[in-house]
Amino acid sequence: GGETSGEGKGMWFGPRL
């Protein structure tokens, strides 16, 4: 959950949060 899709919980969250 960060800026790009990667985690799965957010639409634009990935390698940051």
UniProtKB/Swiss-Prot annotation:
It comes from the Eukaryota. GO terms for biological process: neuropeptide signaling pathway. The keyword Ubl conjugation does not apply. The modification Leucine amide is found at residue 17. One of its GO terms (molecular function) is neuropeptide hormone activity. The keyword Ribosomal protein does not apply. Keywords: Amidation, Neuropeptide, Secreted. One of its GO terms (cellular component) is extracellular region. PROSITE patterns: PYROKININ. Expressed in abdominal perisympathetic organs and abdominal ganglia. InterPro entries: Pyrokinin_CS. It is found in: Secreted. Myoactive. Belongs to the pyrokinin family. This is Pyrokinin-5a.
